[in-house]
Curated annotation (Swiss-Prot):
InterPro entries: FUS1
Covalently lipidated residues, kind N-myristoyl glycine: G2
Post-translational modification: Myristoylation is required for tumor suppressor activity.
Keyword vocabulary terms for this entry: Cell cycle, Lipoprotein, Myristate, Phosphoprotein, Tumor suppressor
Phosphoserine modified-residue sites: S50
Family indicated by similarity: Belongs to the TUSC2 family.
UniProt note on tissues of expression: Strong expression in heart, lung, skeletal muscle, kidney, and pancreas, followed by brain and liver, lowest levels in placenta.
CC annotations in GO: mitochondrion
A GO biological-process term: negative regulation of interleukin-17 production
Protein name: Tumor suppressor candidate 2
Top-level lineage group: Eukaryota
Role description: May function as a tumor suppressor, inhibiting colony formation, causing G1 arrest and ultimately inducing apoptosis in homozygous 3p21.3 120-kb region-deficient cells.
Organism name: Homo sapiens (Human)
Length: 110
């Protein structure tokens, strides 16, 4: 619970080009970004949206519909959550860039 790092295997985009992982690499100053191929920025500009559109085009996290239930001769209104016919919001552009969760730099304030 709480782990939000990527689970993809393979080349890590923020790995240093120096390679090696011995004691000499531990003492050396850590390079920030040295990708092997194309340069990968440490920032995230978009995210996956967490809201949904319903049939009417309304945007919300959850949708409910009112149903009338008759029990012992009494009519009662209940809310039922709608799960069908919802369209995901898709990709949302962030207002300002954020640092990628897998970027290997610790930020601190003095």
């Amino acid at each position: 619970m709480g782990a939000s790092g990527s689970k993809a295997r393979g080349l890590w985009p923020f790995a240093s080009a120096a390679g090696g992982g011995g004691s000499e690499a531990a003492g050396a100053e850590q390079a920030l970004v040295r990708p092997r191929g194309r340069a990968v920025p440490p920032f995230v500009f978009t995210r996956r949206g967490s809201m949904f559109y319903d049939e009417d085009g309304d945007l919300a996290h959850e949708f409910y519909e009112e149903t009338i239930v008759t029990k012992n001769g009494q009519k009662r209104a209940k809310l039922r959550r709608v799960h069908k016919n919802l369209i995901p919001q898709g990709i949302v552009k962030l207002d300002h860039p954020r640092i990628h969760v897998d970027f290997p730099v610790i930020l601190y304030e003095v």
